[in-house]
Regions:
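Alpha/beta-hydrolase fold nucleophile elbow
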Residues: 122-135
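N-terminal cap/lid segment of alpha/beta-hydrolase-fold proteins
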Residues: 24-56
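Loop/turn elements at helix/coil->beta-strand transitions in domains of secreted/extracellular proteins
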Residues: 43-44, 57-60, 82-85, 124-127, ...
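Accessory cap/linker subdomain of secreted extracellular hydrolases
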Residues: 81, 145-252
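Bacterial N-terminal signal peptides
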Residues: 7-18
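Cap/lid segment of the alpha/beta-hydrolase catalytic domain
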Residues: 52-120, 162, 166-169, 304-314
């Protein structure tokens, strides 16, 4: 995680969760790998847990990711040393978790189930804050519209508000480069999972024409990203998209949030819309009054201070803020 995101995340979540971080910091850290939970429909999801090696109960930072939970080591160690339980979980159908991967589809129910599971861990104090950016921001927003009782706040960084416009399409045109690069990258894990399920190839399969290798020709779109075909089949903003559009469900969100966007981010519009939408339509006073927006100099991959040929200076990272 980029240093500005680490510092920002820990500062903001401390405020949102009202964490009582002990003067004994830094804590020694205990790591538990591949901690499992069951979703309401019986799917096993795997998480890594980083927590203070100390007695007592601590607030939870939860990150649900499609990009491999092992990427959370650095943040997990630092968060736990500062007095948080950090839980990073592979989303359904990704890496170590069970089930089938389909973007956005299960994040609301799986997010709810995971928040409630994390709040009940023996070393948790019952308060859960969700953190992370891009698709990990989407997992927060979709969990928030399901209103899990123990969700205390969210920190979505550089994420969308409508997964049709400004994610898959732009002004009615397919965002082809983003869609194809993103789905192709995600498909690599899907392919790996398929091969691992069928480790023993029949000898005759190995002498088929190269274009006929079964792993690569099962189903449409090679079976690796069939949701991409669904996106193409729904070029207009219809019920397919509305079911998981955050903009359709602002009134269901009941928690404070810090929305972090960047002036040169591909999802800048989403950060602004989420902030304004929940501030106006949030499900309770705490949500409506608890929205904050920070817009930084930077793009989707990180902060400035240099964008192209322009150097905005070392103090530019958090120069723009709104209440």
């Amino acid at each position: 995680m980029h240093p500005y995101r680490l510092s920002l995340t820990l500062t903001v979540v401390a405020l949102v969760l009202a964490a009582n971080v002990s003067a004994r910091e830094p804590y020694e850290v205990t790591i538990e790998n591949d901690v499992t939970m069951k979703t309401r429909d019986g799917i096993t999801l795997h998480a890594d847990v980083y927590r203070p090696k100390a007695d007592g109960k601590f607030p939870v930072l939860l990150e649900r990711t499609p990009y491999d939970k092992h990427m959370g080591v650095s943040f997990g160690l630092q968060a736990a040393a500062r007095g948080y339980v950090y839980v990073i979980q592979d989303c359904r159908g990704r890496h170590t978790s069970g089930g089938d991967w389909y973007p956005f589809k299960y994040e609301s129910q799986d997010g709810y189930d995971t928040v409630e599971w994390a709040a009940a861990l023996p070393y948790a104090n019952g308060k859960v804050g969700m953190v992370g950016g891009s698709y990990v921001g989407a997992t927060q927003m979709l969990a928030a519209i399901s209103a899990p009782p123990h969700l205390a706040g969210i920190l979505p960084i550089a994420t969308g508000s409508n997964y049709h416009e400004n994610w898959t399409y732009q002004g009615g045109a397919l965002t082809q480069l983003f869609d194809q690069v993103w789905t192709s990258g995600l498909a690599m894990d899907t392919l790996d999972r398929r091969v691992r399920k069928e480790p023993h190839r029949k000898p005759w399969q190995m002498v088929l024409p190269l274009a006929g290798f079964p792993v690569l020709v099962t189903g449409t779109s090679t079976g690796l990203a069939d949701y991409y075909l669904d996106w193409l089949a729904h070029p207009r903003y219809d019920d397919y998209w509305k079911q998981w559009s955050i903009e359709e469900h602002f009134s269901k969100i009941q928690v404070p949030a810090i929305h972090v966007g960047a002036w040169y981010d591909i999802f800048q519009d989403g950060s602004l819309r989420n902030y304004l939408g929940i501030k106006a339509q949030g499900g309770n006073e705490a949500a409506r009054n608890g929205q904050r927006l920070w817009v930084i100099v930077g793009g989707h991959a990180g902060a400035g201070p240099k964008i192209g040929d322009i150097d905005f200076g070392k103090d530019s990272v958090l120069v723009s803020a709104a209440k």
